[in-house]
UniProtKB/Swiss-Prot annotation:
SMART domains: DHDPS. The gene is dapA. It is an enzyme of class 4 (lyase). Homotetramer; dimer of dimers. It catalyses: L-aspartate 4-semialdehyde + pyruvate = (2S,4S)-4-hydroxy-2,3,4,5-tetrahydrodipicolinate + H2O + H(+). This is 4-hydroxy-tetrahydrodipicolinate synthase. The active site is at 133 (proton donor/acceptor), 162 (schiff-base intermediate with substrate). It comes from Rhizobium meliloti (strain 1021) (Ensifer meliloti). Pathway: Amino-acid biosynthesis; L-lysine biosynthesis via DAP pathway; (S)-tetrahydrodipicolinate from L-aspartate: step 3/4. Pyruvate binds at residues 45, 204. GO terms for biological process: diaminopimelate biosynthetic process; lysine biosynthetic process via diaminopimelate. GO terms for cellular component: cytosol.
Length: 294
């Protein structure tokens, strides 16, 4: 159910800084039209840390309504507060999301037993499939393969992981520990090719915000075993993967989307709605390299 190119959607804002519902709905529609295989609203790229709870919930509702069951919606529902994560998960279920993406608790650095308890409590509170988001670079805690396997065994609704550890061997380790049916989605665009070769089935992608058709075609090629085609597309996309992350990814993605005429380049503080000139030039060059801009 969850595979292929799944953009971690940006959340457009108006010039005044409020959520731009019309632009968000248009972005969802474009993503589906261009071939994206799923959608993730209110993840890190959706600026969830600086959305209010009401805004967070509204964006999930907008995404579910706009997508109209054409592709699965995996709603962000993470928090370092278990009670808060349960509330967001229950809202996503009520709103009609197909699954939830739950990040490992950040800042408070729980033990592996604490991680197990956190995810178990969420799994017991909703019937939705849960995708673990393991990103030690941001959360400063790394869910071990053993903890992940124990969760998958104890709670069948914990169906997969978005892996942003940067350790490609983890895909094989998790496949052996959690089983072949456990859904593994890359959390890093640049390494998605190798990730899928190790047994992954897709990518929750930042770049797909900007190049949805290319990212969808890339994923389809890898999943079909057509690595010659996948490499050709990887070569087109790699400069964009790299350039977008020269500064915080959402800033790079929104700048690129603005250059393509799709939305304003407005982010919330402490992020800045401006890029260093060298970053902007690199993104422009990458857009041209990918054939997205003249």
């Amino acid at each position: 159910m969850f595979k292929g190119s799944i953009p971690a959607l940006v959340t457009p804002f108006t010039a005044a800084g409020s959520v731009d519902a019309d632009s968000f709905v248009a972005h969802v529609e474009w993503q589906i039209k261009e071939g994206s295989h799923g959608l993730v609203p209110v993840g890190t790229t959706g600026e969830s840390p600086t959305l209010s709870h009401d805004e967070h919930k509204k964006v999930v509702e907008l995404c579910v309504e706009a997508s109209a069951r054409r592709v699965p919606v995996i709603a962000g529902a993470g928090s370092n507060n278990t009670i808060e994560a349960i509330e967001l998960a229950q809202h996503a279920e009520k709103a009609g999301a197909d699954a939830i993406l739950v990040v490992t608790p950040y800042y408070n650095k729980p033990t592996q037993k604490g991680l197990f308890a956190h995810f178990a409590a969420i799994a017991e509170s909703v019937k939705l499939p849960i995708v673990i988001y393991n990103i030690p670079g941001r959360s400063v805690v790394d869910m071990s393969v053993e903890t992940m396997a124990a969760l998958a065994k104890a709670h069948p609704t914990i169906v997969g992981v978005k892996d942003a550890t940067g350790r490609i061997e983890r895909v094989s380790e998790q496949r052996m520990a959690c089983g072949k049916a456990f859904v593994q989605l890359s959390g890093e665009d640049a390494t998605a090719l190798g990730f899928n070769a190790h047994g992954g089935v897709g990518c929750i992608s930042v770049t797909a915000n900007v190049a949805p058709r290319l990212c969808a075609e890339f994923q389809e090629a890898t999943l079909a075993g057509n690595y010659a085609k996948a490499l050709e597309l990887q070569d087109k996309l790699m400069p964009l993967h790299k350039a977008i992350f020269l500064e915080p990814g959402v800033c790079g993605a929104k700048y690129a989307l603005n250059r393509l005429g799709r939305m304003s380049f407005t982010v919330r503080s402490p992020l800045l709605s401006a890029l260093e000139p060298a970053t902007a030039s690199a993104i422009d060059a990458a857009l041209r390299h990918a054939g997205l801009m003249n």
